[in-house]
Structure formats: C-alpha cells, structure tokens
Swiss-Prot record:
Top class in the EC scheme: transferase
Lineage, opening ranks: Archaea, Methanobacteriati, Methanobacteriota, Stenosarchaea group, Methanomicrobia
Active-site feature positions: 148 (proton donor/acceptor)
Organism whose genome encodes this protein: Methanosarcina mazei (strain ATCC BAA-159 / DSM 3647 / Goe1 / Go1 / JCM 11833 / OCM 88)
Gene Ontology cellular component annotations, sorted alphabetically: cytoplasm
Protein name stated in the entry: Acetate kinase
Catalytic activity: acetate + ATP = acetyl phosphate + ADP
Site (Transition state stabilizer): 180, 241
C-alpha cells in the first residue's frame, strides 16, 4: 500500500509518498511559492536522485498536478501512474473539540474543518485547499485528516480550561487545544521503545523545538498537559512568537502604539520571540554566531528561550510526579547542541545530566545523558509524515475498501 502524505500551507505544499509495506519514503517533495512569482517544485527520491523544476504554480490544484507529474516522471518518478496511490493522508492543524483521532474525510469532516477556520485562520484554510485539490485530481481515492490537536484531547478539563467566564467557553470554545500533537505522539512512543518500557508505564516530557515550539507532558502514552493553548501563540518564547505574556500588555501596547487587533496579532505572532528580542533573526544559528561574537541582545534572546523551556520542564515534572525522560525533537531540538545545553544546565539537582560529546551527535536517535543520571535525555528525530501515513493506512483498512488491486 502506498500513501501520499500532504501538508498544505498558504504558499507551500510538502509531500511524501510512503510505501507502507516497509514504511519507507519513496519520494519527498516540496512546492514553494504557490500563488507567488518564481514558484518551484523539488523532489528527492529514495535513491537520492533529485528533481528541481521552476514552474508556474498559481494555486494548490496546479501544485498537486505537478506533484503527480513528478511522482510519475519517467526519469525522476517512483510510480508508473497515479493509480498506485492507494490513499492520501492530510495534515490538518485544528480539529477543535470534535476530533480526538484521525478521520476519514467526508462532507461532515470537511465542514468541521471549515468550522475551525476562525480558530486556525493561518492553517486550516490552506489545509482545506489541499484536501479539495486532491479530491479534484484523485476522485475516489480515500483521504484521511490527521489533526495536530487530536493527541491533546486527553488533557483534563482543569488543565485545558482558562479561568474566564464559563459562558465564553460554551459560546466560542475558548480553551487550551494544544498543537504539534502528531510529533509529540511519535516521539513519546519512540521514547518508550528506547527506554525499553511499556508505553503505559512511561512518563516523558517532549520538547518540539522549531520556529514554533511546544512542550508536552506525556503519561502512559497520553498527553496530560501542553504549552500551546487556544492558538499556537501561547507557551514558551519562539522564533517570532512571544509566547505567554501578561494579557494586560496587549491593550497597553495597542493604546500606546495606536495598533489595531490585526496589527497587535501580527506583532505578537511575527515580530516577537527571539527575533523581537534580538532585533536580528529568528534563525537560532544566526543568534548563536552573533552571541559568540558578543552580541548582547542575541545572547539575551537565547537565554530567554532556554529559560522559559527549563521552567516548563520543572513544572511538568511536578505535573507528572516525576519523569523518566526529557525528549528533544524538531529542527532546533534535534540539531542544536548548544540550545539543549543551555536548557539543561544546572539541572543535576533533579537527576538531569548530559554527556557533552554525545550531545554533539546529530541526525540520529540517541540517549545523551550520563550513565549516573536518573532522568534520561533523548534526542529523537520526529517523523510526523510516517505517523500520518500509519493513521491513514489503519483507517483505510478498517473503514474503506481500497480501489487499487495493489495488496495492502
């Protein structure tokens, strides 16, 4: 069985074609600058052979047509025809309160995704465009929506409710939802395997650190607390997002700077975080380099980022009543030894110690803690696409009859 995994953004479309017989990616690709000048599609095959093509991509439908062309290309492709694609798995950022698991896409599911547009205005509309475009190009192919929020549905009400008038929750669904769920789920499962323990006996804190960052407390394979909230703006400081701040700061800035609600939203989401503090960059490599050369604002930005995460780790150890492992994943979590070192410095009092040499190793699953540490520190590259493909396969095997004669 072959599953096409789609992650549609506002001007980009990431995809992977995964052969589920051995869970290997046959091709990984990206359409960039959709609806903008100088659009490009790049695709890398399992054997390293790479296609790069500049072409006009005015919308997501045209982009997906180019994806199919690339996958079936006589020189760079990996399948003979589109009929070899048995199912499509779509990443959908927000499932609201309706979805606690992945779902076979039908009219009801599509409407529920649209109902969440106001909860995730930057993400759900392009996710839906990806779904609609796929349905036009591949009619009859079963499609599954995998929600970023679904993993966090096990968070208890006392953790997800805000101390606001209850009717605001009843009227508008204002509560913590959490995000990056697919990533947190994957690495928590891998952590249990690396620890050699049954999933139900493991307590881990998973740190998904990228331009957007979130931390999750996972107990017995279930999310019981997470840093992102009603939107991905809540939580730790991030690349361009401020994270949690005193809410009274918002009207204060609006009044002083004469900003509209849209402008203050842009300021907090796109001009804050380490970019805002450093006045330099949201790329942590740039900040590391600048800090090493004495740039004090770059150093402060890195200190704030690490401190906020360290504080959450302490908080979540209390929430979990102890922890077996701290897990680092995503772009920064997997690749930045210096950030991991900053976060975990001076935590030996609670059993967290890292091996400096192991901490430098990149691109693989590894335990970087010292032998005498009582809490393991694991670096686990995330694989959201494989998780989406697995869910898609499982739902297709139980809920639909695949149209292809290719055996599952």
């Amino acid at each position: 069985m072959k599953v096409l995994v789609i992650n549609a953004g506002s001007s980009s479309l990431k995809y992977q074609l995964i052969d589920m017989t051995n869970e290997s990616a046959l091709a990984i690709g990206l359409c960039e600058r959709i609806g903008i000048d100088n659009s490009i599609i790049t695709q890398k095959r399992f054997d390293g052979k790479k296609l790069e093509k500049q072409t006009d991509l005015p919308n997501h439908k045209i982009a997906l047509e180019e994806v199919v062309k690339a996958l079936t290309d006589s020189e760079f492709g990996v399948i003979k025809s589109m009929d070899e694609i048995n199912a499509v798995g779509h990443r959908v950022v927000h499932g609201g309160e309706k979805f606690n698991s992945s779902a076979l896409i039908n009219e009801g599911v599509e409407q529920a995704i649209k109902d969440c547009f106001e909860l995730a205005p930057l993400h759900n509309p392009p996710n839906m465009m990806g779904i609609s475009s796929c349905q036009e190009i591949m009619p009859g192919v079963p499609m599954v929506a995998v929600f970023d929020t679904a993993f966090h549905h096990t968070i208890p009400p006392y953790a997800y409710m805000y101390a606001l008038p209850y009717e605001l929750y009843e009227k508008y669904g204002i509560r913590k939802y959490g995000f990056h769920g697919t990533s947190h789920f994957y690495v928590a499962k891998r952590a249990a395997a690396m620890l050699g323990k049954p999933e139900q006996d493991v307590k881990v804190i998973t740190c998904h650190l990228g331009n957007g960052s979130s931390i999750t407390a996972v107990k017995g394979g279930k999310s019981i607390e997470t840093t992102m909230g009603f939107t991905p703006l809540e939580g730790v400081a991030m690349g361009t997002r401020c994270g949690s701040i005193d809410p009274a700061v918002v009207p204060f800035i609006m009044e002083k700077e004469g900003l509209s609600t849209r402008e203050i939203d842009t300021l907090m989401n796109k001009k804050s975080g380490v970019l805002g503090v450093s006045s330099l960059s949201n790329d942590f490599r740039d900040l590391d380099e600048a800090a090493s050369k004495g740039n004090q604002k770059a150093e402060l930005a890195l200190e704030i980022f690490a401190y906020k995460i360290k504080k959450v780790i302490g908080e979540y150890i209390a929430v979990l009543n102890g922890v077996d492992a701290i897990v680092f994943t995503a772009g920064i979590g997997e690749n930045s030894a210096s950030i991991r070192k900053r976060i975990l410095a001076d935590l030996d009092g609670i059993g967290i110690k890292i091996d400096e040499e192991k901490n430098k190793i990149r691109g693989q699953e590894i335990d970087i803690s010292t032998p005498d540490a009582t809490v393991r520190v694991l670096v686990i590259p995330t694989n959201e696409e494989l998780t989406i493909a697995r869910d898609t396969k499982e739902i297709c095997e139980t809920e639909v009859k695949l149209r292809s004669s290719v055996p599952i």
